[in-house]
């Protein structure tokens, strides 16, 4: 869960950096996976207004836009279709850098000049993994010509927490504020929930709620009259964007804001769209159809809990509202829903419907039903603060099985014995009180009142854990234990080294071993520039000779020597690998050099770049690094500028692979193309996930469709595959490249790329109409993102 650092500081006085807080929270049991700075990479992207839109004369799906960027008018050619004249959108100008590192240049699209590119949330790095089709449309009052990072408040730090299933109370900013306050020995502030009722009408006179199923633990509602739907204020939009949620309008934003802040999902119904005064919570009937807010019609069964208006379904309980009752621009009266539903039922239905939302992800973890009242009060307070409506009198509250606080009694001496500590009862009380576990000391006994939101505190061991983590595991003294000496197990590096070796051998490679000392002249042979940092080497005081006088900073010369030696002995097909170290000197000569563990792969004879890439992909698979990607690079002087790639995982470079530069081949006396990969094993091991998980064989068949695409030469295979998978979603099981063609019938500067795409749904047999819908979506995404055209057969 992503928690903006600035939002956290609204509730706790924090006197440390986000990184320091992340470390402290991780030590106290709230694991922070990473601290990210949203939008830090993007450059030269500004807000603009589209003044005029015309059809491209030579391309049906392209439009020519005249754009005001404040300082001048420019022309942008786009394939997007969700904008209109006078809309304000982000535009990446010539030289701009997108969130993924892509650079934007001025160019021509089908003969028309385009001075940049309009941007979506994805290009800005704020889509948060959600699928985005179309441009990001900014509010009408957005200024023109302002840096988008300044306007959206990017460059802000966000803490990404790993929340376990037994801590639903931490699925909110307030929950993490409570943990932060306890960890830093501070107090936290509750958000404002006070408001004034200004409408004399009572919701209980207008709405009746009936709950016909025990799957609904609690259902609360409150009415708002004289609603004014408008964009949210900037501060609220910034909070939502920082947390990865797109602002929509003030009413919807309030429900999303409360969900993120307190952890309680909410929904707002347009009162005029409710067909009667009766709201009924009950199960759907088998075969019922319902169109959700994402404009998709879904077929329901009798397991799905629904909210009905007496005549028809208006929401899927705990999952998503309906298109028929959502808040619109002209909505004037709403009903706020704050409810609590059975977590198991929500989880099953969410999975069966293929609809996992922020709401369902919280309900499925069994959030506290008593949170519903607090959230409803908070939403009404925000309505008053934003001046977007008048709160009606009365509250509807159907709460049949009230959940109450429980009491635990635990011995102080038992906790000390269990933890190996000698803490005073008062110290334990401070730790527990800071977590809202209200504690009373009665002699050697702690009497703890456990709030309903702490479903994980149930036995005395749970209490001891809370004391230990807030007191600080690092503050508990270490003690020696008596034990027998056993053979030391292999560490992670040794086990991974063995896995790498096994993978290389299984790929048909032979292991080679070379000296770590080399000649300074090898850098000339691999065409390293004179000012390169690779020439900054550790010198050996008593070398065996000139050829072994320095420690290597690159393993490429060693591999090229091995390949050249084999070539000189007429070995026509060679497949080698080596695991060795490089030695990078530190600025302080008295310090030891930095050693990096490098895997070098070298092949030649009856092979090409894709053979080398396949070997590397096998390695990535064995190390659990499937999310790594290949990015074209041309600045490495030792490699062929058009046939070289950088291996990247996130923002970390894992190495380089490609064809060796012809000049380097000539320097080593090799007349055939050589392909080499230099991979940083230390970096790969940091990300390695080698655990195996059971996955049952698929019950339903896969269906394969072939597509042949016409794309620019500069478009990478990786970009195409990424676009296919992102647009296709979970039903795309496999994307396999089977043909790359240039030649007759292919325009100059273009290439034909052919893929076989396998579609499979784990929950049902896909029909042609299902596949056609996804297939068409993929083609649209490829055209929009990469300018790809379906090649005519």
UniProtKB/Swiss-Prot annotation:
Where in the numbering of this chain does the tRNA-binding domain appear?
39-149
SMART domains (UniProt xref): B3_4, B5, FDX-ACB
Q: What reaction does this enzyme carry out catalytically? A: tRNA(Phe) + L-phenylalanine + ATP = L-phenylalanyl-tRNA(Phe) + AMP + diphosphate + H(+)
Gene3D superfamilies (alphabetical): 3.30.56.10, Bira Bifunctional Protein, Domain 2, Ferrodoxin-fold anticodon-binding domain, Nucleic acid-binding proteins, Phenylalanyl-trna Synthetase, Chain B, domain 3
Entry binding sites for Mg(2+):
456, 462, 465-466
Could you give the cofactor binding note from the entry?
A: Binds 2 magnesium ions per tetramer.
Query: One GO term of the cellular component aspect?
Result: phenylalanine-tRNA ligase complex
Q: Which CDD domains match?
A: PheRS_beta_core, tRNA_bind_bactPheRS
Q: Please state the protein's primary subcellular location.
A: cytoplasm
Q: Which UniProt keywords apply?
A: Aminoacyl-tRNA synthetase, ATP-binding, Cytoplasm, Ligase, Magnesium, Metal-binding, Nucleotide-binding, Protein biosynthesis, RNA-binding, tRNA-binding
The residues covered by the FDX-ACB domain are: 698-791
Q: Which Pfam families match?
A: B3_4, B5, FDX-ACB, tRNA_bind, tRNA_synthFbeta
Which SUPFAM superfamilies does UniProt cross-reference here? Anticodon-binding domain of PheRS (SSF54991), Class II aaRS and biotin synthetases (SSF55681), Nucleic acid-binding proteins (SSF50249), PheT/TilS domain (SSF56037), Putative DNA-binding domain (SSF46955)
Family label: Belongs to the phenylalanyl-tRNA synthetase beta subunit family. Type 1 subfamily.
Q: How does it assemble?
A: Tetramer of two alpha and two beta subunits.
Q: Which PANTHER family match?
A: PHENYLALANINE--TRNA LIGASE BETA SUBUNIT, PHENYLALANYL-TRNA SYNTHETASE BETA CHAIN AND LEUCINE-RICH REPEAT-CONTAINING PROTEIN 47
Under which name does UniProt file this protein? Phenylalanine--tRNA ligase beta subunit
Q: Which organism is it from?
A: Clostridium perfringens (strain 13 / Type A)
